Amino acid sequence: MPSTPSLKVVHELPACTLCVGPLEDAVTAPCGHTFCRLCLPTLSQMGAQSSGKILLCPLCQEEEQAETPMAPVPLGPLGETYCEEHGEKIYFFCENDAEFLCVFCREGPTHQAHTVGFLDEAIQPYRDRLRSRLEALSMERDEIEDVKCREDQKLQVLLTQIENKKHQVEAAFERLQQELEQQRCLLLARLRELEQQIWKERDEYITKVSEEVSRLGAQVKELEEKCQQPASELLQDIRVNQSRCEMKTFVSPEAISPDLVKKIRDFHRKILTLPEMMRMFSENLAHHLEIDSGVITLDPQTASRSLVLSEDRKSVRYTRQKKNLPDSPLRFDGLPAVLGFPGFSSGRHRWQVDLQLGDGGGCTVGVAGEGVRRKGEMGLSAEDGVWAVIISHQQCWASTSPGTDLPLSEIPRYVGVALDYEAGQVTLFNAQTQEPIFTFAASFSGKVFPFFAVWKKGSCLTLKG
């Protein structure tokens, strides 16, 4: 890259080349010499030559063609930079070498064939490019600021949602704690009530037994005294004494009544199930929180030609007119089916489907293995790599081998699918009532995908969420 010539900066006022005084109303000739306008000779004084040329600069005697404009060229703002080599002011710029030039530099052999212009003229293209770049950068900056503003708004929305969810979680657990505390108080109150009943019946039992012991003690003492009486006295009251000696059967009272024992046993059974209920609740809560309810979409590469997918790939409907689609080893051609995306090879996952059944039509919802048959006739069973339920207006059955008829009270409109890969479990349930429809036990190997099929005109299913 050409180096910039050495410049020296002085702090003197520019001088006229003719009068050597400060420049007033400065102009420059094409050669680069600078004069006061009043110091420059008139054109008639320069004189026209017979060769058709005129003298433009009285110092360097430079001649130009007569048709060349002879008016002195006005200077732009004069700087205070001088050529260090020649001591002349810098007026020119060489675009080829990117160097500042004085008059002598410009006339030198180095720059004869180069593009040389006045500083003000030479700088204009650069200024234009800088302005253009400045405009582009300003636009880019504005766009980035707009994007940043939008992203900040999205971020703020997310942060607000997170804050709301935090409050919801705190409120939910606070309500749960209140309900658990209420149930704890009820259980303890019931236990205290049973405890009081036990003590009450114990006191009653002790009272009855004590009374009987006292009665028997008094009778024993009386009989002992009779035994010490003389025969004449004892025989005198023989009939009375015999009646007193007759044994009376004492019915021993029960310490705790059978009714109270039954209440205690019933309550004991309830208490025994409490730890298991708490454990199941904890496991179900953890299970629910671990479930991935991510976005499921329909994979168009697997869709049968008899199916029409929505633009957002969330809905599919049946059509009698098969679509002209490129063949693919992934595409179903024997069954109007489509797989969901993504597939899963681990974890717990859940999704929900809205069903619309056409006249005589139906839908299939479930899970299929990655190696499920795509071409020709395919079976719907676990042996074929499909774990699903088939739903029509009249009935619902599971894709077992043979199929399992599911006598439901009503045909579900919304069906949920819960996949537990590690447990090898696929559960389908009524998403409105949360009632289970059917649970498959499986041993997965490789990826499994959400599986859907619809048949007959008017049948349609839509992924929710």
Swiss-Prot record:
SUPFAM superfamilies cross-referenced by the UniProt entry: B-box zinc-binding domain, Concanavalin A-like lectins/glucanases, RING/U-box
Species this protein is from: Macaca mulatta (Rhesus macaque)
Free-text function comment from the UniProt entry: E3 ubiquitin ligase that plays a role in several processes including innate antiviral immnity, cell migration and chemotaxis. Acts as a 'Lys-63'-specific ubiquitin ligase for MAPK1/ERK2 and MAPK3/ERK1, promoting their activation by facilitating their interaction with MAP2K1 and MAP2K2. Also plays a role in cell migration and chemotaxis by acting as a stable focal adhesion component upon recruitment by multi-adapter protein paxillin/PXN. Functions in the RIGI-mediated interferon induction pathway upstream or at the level of MAVS.
CDD domains from the UniProt entry: Bbox2_TRIM10-like, SPRY_PRY_TRIM15
GO biological process, one term: positive regulation of type I interferon production
UniProt GO molecular function: molecular sequestering activity; transcription coactivator activity; ubiquitin protein ligase activity; zinc ion binding
Binding site for Zn(2+): C83, H86, C105, H111
Subunit composition and interactions: Interacts with paxillin/PXN; this interaction recruits TRIM15 to focal adhesions. Interacts with TRIM8; this interaction prevents TRIM8 cytoplasmic translocation.
Span of zinc fingers (B box-type): 78-119
Reaction it catalyzes: S-ubiquitinyl-[E2 ubiquitin-conjugating enzyme]-L-cysteine + [acceptor protein]-L-lysine = [E2 ubiquitin-conjugating enzyme]-L-cysteine + N(6)-ubiquitinyl-[acceptor protein]-L-lysine
Name under which the protein is recorded: E3 ubiquitin-protein ligase TRIM15
Enzyme Commission code: 2.3.2.27
CC terms in the record's Gene Ontology section: cytoplasm; focal adhesion; nucleus
SMART domains associated with the record: BBOX (SM00336), PRY (SM00589), RING (SM00184), SPRY (SM00449)
Keywords attached to this entry: Cell junction, Coiled coil, Cytoplasm, Metal-binding, Nucleus, Transferase, Ubl conjugation pathway, Zinc, Zinc-finger
Coiled-coil ranges from the UniProt annotation: 126-229
Similarity comment text for this entry: Belongs to the TRIM/RBCC family.
B30.2/SPRY domain residues: 276-465
Places the protein is found: Cytoplasm; Nucleus; Cell junction, Focal adhesion
Gene3D superfamilies xrefs: 2.60.120.920, Classic Zinc Finger (3.30.160.60), Zinc/RING finger domain, C3HC4 (zinc finger) (3.30.40.10)
Pfam family, one: PRY
Organism ancestry: Eukaryota, Metazoa, Chordata, Craniata, Vertebrata
Zinc finger (RING-type): 16-61
Superkingdom field: Eukaryota
